[in-house]
């Protein structure tokens, strides 16, 4: 296998190009560096930048079918073995639970024992954790450990996001116990976030499990075991997502029941008010349409007596409703 020279990986608009020093640290790539399995190169690109796109389209260091995938063609998490290398698509959780649920960032990478090429359009926050460890000298030492650390960081971010959603569901359940209904669209957004998470994290767990079972030459048995642990941890997160989705369905039914009961109470109250004032409306209408003149209009106490009669009628109807336990 021909050696890779550092000059072949120099891209002006690359996000960064680092060489792993084999001791947990990194150093910037130079033209004189020789890339091998002991000191692999990590090249991180934004595939929308012109120089990076041109390099991806023309470089002989990548297989032809890898170039299109790294340029943004693949979206769902998946892994494809290509010789001794692997083409991997992963999803990362960026931001907070207040964002729209489609804010899952795609990261695509191809790696073998000497070269790691990762691409993205939007920033992948999980990579900052790995890069920070490398700059402090506590990071991965080779390609296999790098992949494990990246997958672990992605799972940490996913688990944290799932925990935030779980806390919001608990708060929502407490509010419903106090008959407090959430704002319109709040529960729908929360449910959609969970469904989108389920859609992408389930195949991502399968990617981790596949990497744990593949006999890639640049991954050790210990690294495969760690990858299997990561897959199981993400699987537990998926179980939590399923539980949260079921709980949101129950809360949706509870909210509908609360709204129905509130509407029924209002309708009941309006019906009682109509029943109370119906006799008085009848009497006032009856007196008003008397063509021979309103009875008692010539007596100075006629209007007062009529008002008193209305009060007695309304009071009698209210007493009857109360005795019948309608009021």
Curated annotation (Swiss-Prot):
User: Could you list the residue ranges that cross the membrane?
Assistant: 274-294, 301-321
Q: What is this protein called?
A: Zinc transport protein ZntB
Query: Where is it located?
Result: Cell inner membrane
**Cross-referenced SUPFAM superfamilies:** CorA soluble domain-like, Magnesium transport protein CorA, transmembrane region
Q: How is it placed in the membrane, per its record?
A: Multi-pass membrane protein
Q: Which reaction does it catalyse?
A: Zn(2+)(out) + H(+)(out) = Zn(2+)(in) + H(+)(in)
Keyword Cell membrane applies? yes
